[in-house]
A protein has these predicted regions:
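Interfacial segments of alpha-helical transmembrane regions
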Residues: 7-14, 81-95, 150-160
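Alpha-helical transmembrane segments of multi-pass membrane proteins
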Residues: 18-36
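Hydrophobic core of alpha-helical transmembrane segments in multi-pass integral membrane proteins
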Residues: 19-22, 137-140, 156-165
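Membrane-interface interhelical loops and short amphipathic "cap" helices
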Residues: 36-51, 111-121
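Interfacial helix-start motif at the membrane-water boundary
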Residues: 45-65
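Internal transmembrane alpha-helix with an interfacial aromatic "cap," most often the third helix
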Residues: 61-89, 136-147
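Aromatic-anchored segments of alpha-helical transmembrane domains
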Residues: 96-106, 161-165
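Membrane-proximal helix-loop-helix units in multi-pass membrane proteins
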Residues: 100-145
Length: 165
């Protein structure tokens, strides 16, 4: 069996990011009276004036750092491996993660919902990019899986992830 290196362990930070984000999404509504998860965006929980902002920041503190480190080491690990199409899909996903991590921190909603301020316009622009890349990257990975047997498992996982969106 191959010895695991630092990059392998950094890849596990994706699990930490998932747990941090899940905790923020599950528990922050408890600090937001009247929050309706069926009618309101998750961004409302981290809006500049949201009553849940402090709890959101605490619970999601590890999310951005861990997601960016994880996706970056995945990009490092995939270099020169598999197909160019698969790598392109993974790199697009990494770009989406970086845009999400930086963009949402720079431009949280100014108010729950949409107040129309410059900050809100930028938040929506970040959201549009994140949504576009969140769809494009798995589609490219699915195509890579359909074209190459060595990428099939990546394609299946991407198809499941896309279906869950």
């Amino acid at each position: 069996m191959k010895k695991k290196n630092f990059i392998n362990y950094c890849g596990l930070l994706g699990v930490v990011a998932f747990l941090s984000y899940t905790a923020a999404v599950v528990f922050s509504p408890l600090a937001y009276p009247g929050y309706n998860w069926m009618a309101q965006a998750v961004s409302d929980l981290s809006a500049a004036n949201a009553p849940s902002l402090a709890l959101w920041n605490q619970l999601s503190a590890l999310y951005n750092v861990c997601e960016v480190v994880c996706v970056t080491v995945v990009c490092i690990g995939i270099q020169g491996r598999k197909t160019k199409l698969l790598r392109s899909g993974i790199y697009l996903f990494a770009v989406m993660e970086w845009i999400s991590a930086v963009g949402y921190r720079m431009f949280p909603l100014s108010d729950s919902g949409y107040a129309g301020a410059f900050q809100d316009v930028m938040h929506m622009a970040v959201t549009a990019l994140v949504v576009l890349l969140s769809i494009a990257s798995p589609v490219i990975i699915i195509v890579a899986g359909a074209k190459s047997k060595s990428c099939r498992s990546y394609g299946v996982c991407a198809a499941v992830a896309l279906a869950m969106m």
